[in-house]
Amino acid sequence: KVITDKMPLNFRYIGFILSAFPEAKIIHLKRDARATCWSIYKHYFSSKGNGFSYDQNDLAAFYHLYTELMTFWHQQFPDKIYDLCYEDLTTNQEEETRQLLDYCNLDWDKNCLNFHTNKRAVKTASALQVRQKMYQGSSEAWRQYEDHLQPLINALKPVS
């Protein structure tokens, strides 16, 4: 059985998930830190617990905590977490998707490249993106606001 949940704060629960589901495999989608933080910063989250996302310094501090926790999870569960680079996925979609499916012990299906044509209901902050083909360049969108993001960029420098 395959279950997916892409909530951005799920990284906090990897230990619980793998304890409850020892056969689970975690897919960790890594992306440029500035692109990740910009994506969070520009979005309004209606749920509580996301106040860090509205302050550039708080967001950078949270991002550093995230990277530290992911390092810890990798040490604790070295064979259970698959790192997938977002930028690689957007430039080499088929190759990266095949490697991911191989890790998950799932068969290749050409429809993996046509995910945007799926008609099922999707409830996510990025619902519109789910209906689009994969495209390159979104990891550079933050550059349009670079002058206004200096506190964030400076605070991220050790990991950017």
Predicted regions and their residues:
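PAPS-dependent sulfotransferases, especially Golgi type II membrane carbohydrate sulfotransferases
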Residues: K1-V2, I40-D83, T91-S160
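Glycine-rich phosphate-binding loop used to anchor ATP phosphates in small-molecule kinases
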Residues: K1-L18
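Short, solvent-exposed loop/turn segments at secondary-structure junctions
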Residues: P8-F11, D32-A35, H43, E87-T91
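Short N-terminal helix/helix-N-cap motif within the alpha/beta-hydrolase-1
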Residues: R12-G15, W38, E94
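Hydrophobic/aromatic-lined pockets within catalytic cores
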Residues: R12, P22, N105
